[in-house]
Structures are given as C-alpha cells and as structure tokens.
Amino acid sequence: MEYANNMKPVDLDELKQYIVNANGYVKMVYLHWSAGRYHEIYDDYHISVDNDGRIYLPDPDLTIKRNHTWKRNSNSVGIAVCGCLDAQPNSGYNTDFGSYPVTDAQIEAVSMIIALFAKYGGVPVECCLTHCEAAYHDGYGPYSGDEETRWDLWYLPDSGMGGQMRGGGEVLRGKARWYMQQSVA
C-alpha cells in the first residue's frame, strides 16, 4: 500500500464522468476502510473518501487494476473510507471503529458514489459489497479463523434508525437506493 499525498479532491460531477467512461468494464464495487488515519489516502483503492466526505482518486481511469480485495480485483473498483486505525470488530454490533472512526459524511458520500455506479456505470446496487461481505463469501470473514480475516464495514450506524448498528452493506446500499429515488445521484 503506497501513501499518495498529493491528490486533489473531485466532485460528484467529475466522478460521474469517470464512472461513465468505465461503464461496461466495472462489474463489481468493493467497499473498504483504509485502516489508517483521516487524510491518509492510499493508491490501492480507486476512490478514497476522507472524513469530511471529500472524494479522492489516484487516477481518473477506473479500469486500472488495483489490489484492494483478494481474488476480486479484476473488473472491479475499490472504494475506501479513510480511517479506522486500530479498529476492533468485537461482535459487530459493538464495533470499535478505532481512533479515526467512520463518519456520517463518509457514509453519505460512499452511498452517493454507489448510486452513481448504479445509475451511470451499469453496476447494480446489489453488486456493491463491503470487503467483509466478500470475505464471508470467500471464507475469510469474521469468525472464519483465518489469520487474514477482513471485516471492513461489517456493521455501520444507520442514521435513519437512530444510529442503530446494522449490516454495513445494507446501510450503504439502502442509502444509495434512496439517493437514486431522490435523483441526487
């Protein structure tokens, strides 16, 4: 993982154009956290979202293969929220997000990005999975006993449910559907 510190933020309109350019190539979107600090952006991911919701890309070409999800890097895009250094899974419902927890601004921005991929990139909302969900499918998710367990975004607080912890993928995909209905994305 290489730290890329000289990236400039892009807005949703710019990102939409990059997504349109990748339409037909990208089949899946995987959602991560960087396991680092806010403002640390790594080039393993196509898109990074900082704590204030700003969006960063190491390159506008979303078809470049990046190493973000084991055995799932081809024809996919990796999106990471910056943060979650020292996070602990506990039982999921009581996740400790560490010293740089996922913010509401990150949850909203990632949800809008998912909506953009669904609307302009030909990637159904259902094809946007957290790294934890992908890890469950591939046998290295929580409780698997695997040394390389991945539980990125296993659970997230759902602001629509008073901050109750729910499956992270459910929260993000649900918000993406809402953004699509509201024509925000």
Model-predicted segments: where are they?
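Basic/polar, cationic surfaces and motifs that engage anionic cell-wall
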Residues: 1-23, 86, 90-185
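Short, low-complexity, polar/charged sequence segments that are solvent-exposed and flexible
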Residues: 48-52, 67, 76-77, 97-101, ...
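Structural preference for beta-strand elements that scaffold enzyme active sites
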Residues: 28, 76-78, 127-129
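A mature extracytoplasmic/lumenal domain signature
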Residues: 35, 61, 83-85, 132-134
